[in-house]
Amino acid sequence: GESIVFSAGTSEVTPRRLKQTFEAEVADRTPRDSFYHCLKNSAHQFHNQQEGEHYILAGYPWFKCRARDMFISLPGLTLALDEVDQFEDVMKTAEKAIRSFINDEPAGYKIYEMEHPDVLLWAVWALQQYAKETSREQCRQKYGELLKDIMEFIRQRRHENLFLHDNGLLFANGTDKAITWMNSTVNGHPVIPRTGYIVEFNALWYNALRFIADLVREGGDVYLADELDAQ
């Protein structure tokens, strides 16, 4: 039989293009014919584009793009689906936000809570997953300078609440403000204030040291690699 195309809207469209537009949307749609495709469709719902920038929403209905949640979830929402280009799109926006933060410039991007102490360490972890999915060489070429800048920012003690002590561990103060994933608050105060050598921060720190040291050594920067190995 013949197809009938019906369109209703608040503005005029060219009728002869309706079928072509519909078919293009159907082709772009993720089918719901398997458990994998249902997961893939759900993953795509967390992607958010605004003004040419790419973000990952922390959740629905009210969460925005939160830095820690973005870096933790980014590999699973992109690389696990063989969508390397989507990872790079989000990281392109994230890199600009990171550089604004470490250079103490006004935040011009809609990524919130960038100041939390472990965010940069999670960014390194996300890039480590990118290196596993693509190659260490590709990661070094595309993100090597960013990784080195993050490492120097931490090692030079420029973060306002992430302090590298002489024992090689990172210290953070969460007495008055929730700074970890355990971020519930009552009357503006953290329910579980965490201060000190927070275990996951230092696990991420050790991981970042080893990953970046190996990466830069493979790229010929033996001096920096030796410094990180001795950290």
Residue ranges and their predicted role:
Residues 1-231:
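Acidic, mature catalytic/reactive cores of soluble proteins
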